[in-house]
């Protein structure tokens, strides 16, 4: 049967490294009706372990050197002749330092990331010569998709909790204002953004992350040998080793569980700049045999299937894809009470929300582990629910009809 293409879409993102945002992009690409919609995907870098899982029905546009060069050492830009990008990155780095120095605080600053795109925009070529019905910028910063793609409508995604960030409000307001629709991945992520930018309220809506059910279930069936069944309760956390995920506090929480008389092993899957800090905390807590860093895994799902409890101890989230993936696989889940936790799960029904402080977190986990019937109830509740959110793609289609 011939295609009846009604609209064209361009989706812009950065790469396909292991991460929740990237997996939700896979879910989105798998949910689109390619008989009705023509989709071009532009990635700044054709890199990452998830590249092989891109839906082949989406047309992957060629990599463009200027965009890819944002991720390489600055010294190599001089050798490759990327002078415009080099100057932009240098200017952005210096400007971000000035801004952060003038606006000190305890929140995580995203100014350097924002400026790395803002100050290199002038060096970036057009991404495509087409005019699309919709251009989606899937991951912030959102300068390039808006200014280097021709489209009738533009939409930008929010994957984080803006209340937890330090940012240049004037620069971001100007950036976000250029979009027709601003899509948060959870109700609370949308509300947090609306609090930060009330003047953009009429553009904000919620489009939940879409998860690829068949791929997740298929990958979960593969074998793993890193989490043996040795009598200990197997706890798992998956995510980047960064401040947001709070893995640096896992060793102390695990120590408290042990002191509570529980035989547990806590496995961490991921990678990132905070790994040395996490290893230091493991040593300080004496948890070398109990907190085990498994590192980067192309496929975390066999480990999710093998664990007894999935824990997301984050300081902040937009909406954690890994939590939904664990629930999709029928696992009992514990999350900390970060600002958007209420939109992540239904407390006591398909997961448990515990305090973020180490003592409270440990106490909440211990109470659950000592109640097998409750653990089973959580698993059964998860099995009855649809965590793929595949119907959310209709909201994206609607953006082109407004």
Regions from the PLM with identified roles:
Residues 155-159, 163, 177-219:
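Donor nucleotide-sugar binding/catalytic pocket of nucleotide-sugar-dependent glycosyltransferases
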Residues 22-27, 233, 237-256, 262, ...:
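A conserved mid-protein helix/loop that constitutes part of the nucleotide-sugar donor-binding site
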Residues 325, 337-348, 352-353:
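Short acidic/histidine- and often glycine-rich active-site loop of Leloir-type glycosyltransferases
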Residues 332-336:
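Short hydrophobic beta-strand element within catalytic cores of glycosyltransferases
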Residues 296, 315:
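Aromatic "clamp/platform" in nucleotide-sugar-dependent glycosyltransferases that forms part
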Residues 310-311:
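A short hydrophobic beta-strand element within the catalytic core of glycosyltransferases
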Residues 347-348, 352-359, 367-372:
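Conserved acidic donor-binding segment of nucleotide-sugar-dependent glycosyltransferases
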Residues 360, 374-389, 395-398:
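A short, well-ordered alpha-helix in the C-terminal region of glycosyltransferases
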